[in-house]
């Protein structure tokens, strides 16, 4: 399924904002691919379309503990009083308070309370209480969240460790390797994108045979390449093997440890964990998927998931409803080609029902930036008349007052056109995709200009 270069990048950025599968690791993979490092070894980086679940750090750390992976001692607090009690219980001179928000860049973020930084070192239970009170119940604004920010409902209170060295370690599924791959670097605790861009040779990898599984010598080899001292190579390898087993057990698409460290006592610890899970495994990973925190998601993401619709919000003014991810991105590109900006990626899939089409329109029109809508359907498995029924129902029920341009081709297209024509609604039909894109761009510009001038524009255009 081909993905356009332009909107591959746009969707990656949007996925980061909505905490979908595009992570720092995938961004690094893209940079690595561009660097020529993979080509040098006869490998290719391929982006894979997946819907994934991300969990809070404290939940990921609990999974690591259950798997026998070495992690710092810590507990989650949902109030400042709980943070005080945990800090006292840990009995350490200093502890770390980490805001539990599903967004990268926490350390450089700012809370609506005015507190700067979502990761703080404190030196007493009293200070733990004071700092956590400025985090819990407040929104953390980072580069990834945008101005809206994300609510912080709890904090992780954990013991502070003093690392001698920091490393980066991750496991991901990569099609070009035909299975999982371990990725490591001696440069941990920093943005892996920067490492990949500035020093790609610092990143090492070890493909794993999905049938044979991970071998200890593979983990040992990677640990050595990452620069672990000889006296703790075996310990690092053991943690990598346990992480790989966790990766398989829970149908993860990515496990990222940044940093994995050698602490002042010479022990290997995983200081931070990000785990993404394949949403296709929800039926057999109920324990994991019941942990999803919907307060961290855009309300439209939740509605889309409930309706089984692939949706990602963008920043444009033209709503898109398409069947098939490849056609959806091609549609977005042709809108951009003619000077428009898509407001979303929306794929209703090959077997959409009338209800799903209606739900798709609800998602699109809930975005107040949308000034016009383009429906582009190529009916193979998907019947055009079903789409048409959904369009007519949605336009009526939602009282849509912005232009709707429809381009239908394929199965039962004549029945679909008849349904639209007989509806009496001002839905604009167009057989040619290029013409449909030009039309929706012009109409969105007219609506935008009219709203800016406080003019009420009514579209009385023939079908």
Swiss-Prot record:
Locations listed in the record: Mitochondrion
Pathways per UniProt: Carbohydrate metabolism; tricarboxylic acid cycle; succinate from succinyl-CoA (ligase route): step 1/1
Modified residue annotations for N6-acetyllysine: 78, 88, 129, 139, 143, 216, 368, 438
InterPro entries referenced in this protein's UniProt entry, alphabetically: ATP-grasp, ATP-grasp_succ-CoA_synth-type, ATP_grasp_subdomain_1, Succ-CoA_synthase_bsu_CS, SUCC_ACL_C, Succ_CoA_betaA_euk, Succ_CoA_ligase-like_bsu, Succinyl-CoA_synth-like
A GO-annotated cellular component: myelin sheath
SUPFAM superfamilies: Glutathione synthetase ATP-binding domain-like (SSF56059), Succinyl-CoA synthetase domains (SSF52210)
Binding site for substrate: 323, 380-382
Annotated GO biological process: succinate metabolic process; succinyl-CoA metabolic process; tricarboxylic acid cycle
Modified residues (Phosphothreonine): 341
Modified residues (Phosphoserine): 279
Keyword entries, A-Z: Acetylation, ATP-binding, Ligase, Magnesium, Metal-binding, Mitochondrion, Nucleotide-binding, Phosphoprotein, Transit peptide, Tricarboxylic acid cycle
Reaction catalysis annotation: succinate + ATP + CoA = succinyl-CoA + ADP + phosphate
Residue positions where Phosphotyrosine is found in the record: 84
Residue stretches making up the ATP-grasp domain: 61-288
Residues annotated as binding Mg(2+): 258, 272
Site location (Important for substrate specificity): 94, 162
Details of cofactor binding: Binds 1 Mg(2+) ion per subunit.
Boundaries of the annotated transit peptide in chain numbering: 1-53
List of residues that carry N6-succinyllysine: 88
Pfam families per UniProt: ATP-grasp_2, Ligase_CoA
Subunit: Heterodimer of an alpha and a beta subunit. The beta subunit determines specificity for ATP. Interacts with ALAS2.
Annotated function: ATP-specific succinyl-CoA synthetase functions in the citric acid cycle (TCA), coupling the hydrolysis of succinyl-CoA to the synthesis of ATP and thus represents the only step of substrate-level phosphorylation in the TCA. The beta subunit provides nucleotide specificity of the enzyme and binds the substrate succinate, while the binding sites for coenzyme A and phosphate are found in the alpha subunit.
Protein name: Succinate--CoA ligase [ADP-forming] subunit beta, mitochondrial
Lineage: Eukaryota, Metazoa, Chordata, Craniata, Vertebrata
């Amino acid at each position: 399924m081909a993905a356009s270069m332009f909107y591959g990048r746009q969707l990656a950025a949007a996925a980061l904002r909505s905490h979908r599968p595009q992570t720092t690791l995938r961004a690094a993979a893209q940079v690595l691919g561009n660097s020529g490092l993979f080509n040098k070894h006869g490998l290719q980086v391929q982006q894979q379309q997946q819907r994934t679940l991300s969990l809070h750090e404290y939940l990921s750390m609990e999974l690591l503990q259950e798997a026998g992976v070495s992690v710092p001692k810590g507990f989650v607090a949902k109030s400042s009083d709980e943070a005080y009690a945990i800090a006292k219980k840990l009995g350490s001179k200093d502890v770390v308070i980490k805001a539990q928000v599903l967004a990268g860049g926490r350390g450089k973020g700012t809370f609506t309370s005015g507190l700067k930084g979502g990761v703080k070192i404190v030196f007493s239970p009293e200070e733990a209480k004071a700092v956590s009170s400025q985090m819990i119940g407040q929104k953390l604004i980072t580069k990834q969240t945008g101005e809206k920010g994300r609510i912080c409902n709890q904090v992780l209170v954990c013991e502070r460790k003093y690392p001698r060295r920091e490393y980066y370690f991750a496991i991901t599924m990569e099609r070009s390797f035909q299975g999982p791959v371990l990725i490591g670097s001696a440069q941990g605790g920093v943005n892996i994108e920067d490492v990949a861009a500035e020093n790609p040779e610092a990143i090492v990898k070890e493909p794993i045979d999905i049938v044979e599984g991970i071998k200890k010598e593979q983990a040992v080899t990677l640990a050595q390449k990452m620069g672990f001292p000889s006296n703790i190579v075996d310990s690092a390898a053991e943690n990598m093997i346990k992480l790989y087993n966790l990766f398989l057990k829970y149908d993860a698409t990515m496990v990222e440890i940044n940093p994995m460290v050698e602490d002042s006592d010479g022990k290997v610890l995983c200081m931070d964990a990000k785990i993404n899970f394949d949403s296709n495994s929800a039926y057999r990973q109920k324990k994991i998927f019941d942990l999803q925190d919907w307060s961290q998601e855009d309300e439209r993401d939740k509605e889309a998931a409930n309706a089984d619709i692939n949706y990602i919000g963008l920043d444009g003014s033209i709503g898109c409803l398409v069947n098939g991810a490849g056609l959806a991105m091609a549609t977005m590109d042709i809108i951009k080609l003619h000077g428009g900006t898509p407001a979303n990626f929306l794929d209703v899939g090959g077997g959409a029902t009338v209800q799903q089409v209606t739900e798709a329109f609800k998602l699109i029109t809930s975005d107040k930036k949308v000034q016009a809508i383009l429906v582009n359907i190529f009916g193979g498995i998907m019947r055009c008349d079903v789409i048409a029924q959904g369009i007519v129902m949605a336009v009526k029920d939602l009282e849509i007052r912005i232009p709707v341009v429809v381009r239908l081709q394929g199965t039962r297209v004549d029945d679909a056109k008849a349904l639209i024509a007989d509806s009496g609604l001002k839905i604009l039909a167009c057989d040619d995709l290029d013409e449909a894109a030009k039309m929706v761009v012009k109409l969105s510009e007219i609506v935008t200009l009219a709203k800016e001038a406080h003019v009420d524009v009514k579209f009385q255009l023939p079908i």
